[in-house]
C-alpha cells in the first residue's frame, strides 16, 4: 500500500506503468479468449496476488461516456457490476485529475469479512477519445471498524473506436483482500468474478449508456 504523503510523487510512474500493461496483452497468460472478451493474468514479485487484465474490444458507447460511468461517477454506478459494493465517498479532491476515494463492500458470505478500500485515483486524457486512469490504495484513512482493508492496484484505458459511437475498455485489477482471505483463493476465484464483472459492464453501457452520462448534441 502506498503512503499518502508521498503518493503524489508516484502518479506519473503509475500512469506510465499502467499504460504499458494495459496495451501489452502478451504479458498476461490468457484465461478467457473470446471475440467479445479477453481475460489474462500475470504474477508479480511484490505480492502473491496476481495482476489481472480484462479487455472489452467493443463497448456500445464512446470513451467519454464509458469513462464517466466506469471512473468519474464510479460511486453512482459501481453496484451495477460489483454486487458487493455498498457505498462510498470522495475523501479529498486533490486536483482536477486526482482524488482520494473511499468505498465499502459487503460480500454477504458467511465467514468472509466486510471490506473497504481507500484509493488515490489519477486520470489523464491522452488524446481526444483516449482516457487513462490509475488507482492505488493509500493510507489516507484507517479501515472502518469491522472491515478488512483491501490493498488495490487498478488501471483503466478507454479508447473511442472509428465512428465515434463505440469504444474499447481495458482494465487492470490486483486485489490483496487482507484479513483471512489468502492470495491463492483470490487468484483461483478471480477468473469468474472478472468475467461476470466485464459482462455486466458491457450490459450497463449497451445502447449508448445511461442518458445522464451522455453529452447533449451540439
Task: Name each model-derived stretch.
Residues 1-218:
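Eukaryotic helix-grip
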